[in-house]
């Protein structure tokens, strides 16, 4: 089995694993790497099949998490953005002793809309899967544009995300399809009731993929977790609001 691409950066005494979202790679953290690297030892990861972690096919959430866990430090804060939030959450469920704190960013335990649950309509996710086989590049670009919609720096933020994708080899259609399948089918709402490490959830008020309506529902479901909504951010708050984003992580670190 191939190894996944993994880079450590910074010299802080606290380890922080950063997991990117669908279609992207670890370069997405470039704009906050310097700032965070002075406080943490960062573990920058390309998820299996993405970026420089080539040679992997489509995986289930459990398989993806097991692959990432192999390279991970014994103890770290695990931060996952969007799809990466599901991987970080799965890590907290399967290896709680290795997760000092769990941070999910613009992520949902159940991305797909269900009865009484806000999310992305399953037919939209299905549509993305269909379009992937028709026009691969265009579909990924549309998904990226959705992520920054509404922010004051939307155009610039979308360009940043696009440059991250283009900087590395594109994932295979099979891998992207597998990622959408995870977003469409996984539901960790009940399972995450049982995690007992510090748990911080960060959201963008303008996020079109992870609706803020779910925040109070999860506050009730997971009273042990803390939520923070960033007022002018959308789906990529670390790109549009890097200072506030880093501050939230420093505050978490000082509370551990």
Curated annotation (Swiss-Prot):
Catalytic activity as recorded in UniProt: 6-carboxyhexanoyl-[ACP] methyl ester + H2O = 6-carboxyhexanoyl-[ACP] + methanol + H(+)
An individual GO BP term: biotin biosynthetic process
Pathway: Cofactor biosynthesis; biotin biosynthesis
Record InterPro entries: AB_hydrolase_1 (IPR000073), AB_hydrolase_fold (IPR029058), BioH (IPR010076), Carboxylesterase_BioH (IPR050228)
Residues at the active site: 82, 207, 235
Subunit field text: Monomer.
Role noted for this protein: The physiological role of BioH is to remove the methyl group introduced by BioC when the pimeloyl moiety is complete. It allows to synthesize pimeloyl-ACP via the fatty acid synthetic pathway through the hydrolysis of the ester bonds of pimeloyl-ACP esters.
Name this polypeptide is given: Pimeloyl-[acyl-carrier protein] methyl ester esterase
Organism, scientific name: Salmonella agona (strain SL483)
């Amino acid at each position: 089995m191939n190894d996944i691409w993994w880079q450590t950066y910074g010299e802080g005494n606290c380890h922080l694993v950063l997991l990117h979202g669908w279609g992207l790679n670890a370069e997405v953290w470039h704009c906050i790497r310097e700032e965070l690297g002075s406080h943490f030892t960062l573990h920058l990861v390309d998820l299996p099949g993405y970026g420089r972690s080539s040679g992997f096919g489509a995986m289930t959430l459990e398989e993806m998490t097991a692959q990432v866990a192999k390279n991970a430090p014994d103890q770290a804060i695990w931060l996952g953005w969007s799809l990466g939030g599901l991987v970080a959450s799965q890590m907290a469920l399967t290896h709680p002793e290795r997760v000092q704190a769990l941070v999910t960013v613009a992520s949902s335990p159940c991305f797909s809309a269900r009865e009484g649950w806000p999310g992305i309509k399953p037919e939209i996710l299905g549509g993305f899967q269909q379009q992937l086989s028709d026009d691969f590049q265009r579909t990924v670009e549309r998904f990226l544009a959705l992520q920054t919609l509404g922010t004051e720096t939307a155009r610039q933020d979308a360009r940043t995300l696009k440059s991250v994708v283009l900087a590395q080899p594109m994932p295979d259609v099979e891998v992207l399809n597998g990622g959408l399948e995870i977003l469409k089918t996984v539901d960790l709402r009940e399972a995450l009731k049982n995690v007992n490490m510090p748990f911080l959830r960060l959201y963008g008020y303008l996020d079109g993929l992870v609706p803020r309506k779910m925040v109070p529902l999860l506050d009730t479901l997971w009273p042990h977790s803390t939520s923070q909504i960033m007022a002018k951010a959308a789906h990529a708050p670390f790109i549009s609001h890097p200072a506030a984003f880093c501050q939230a992580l420093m505050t978490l670190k000082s509370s551990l």
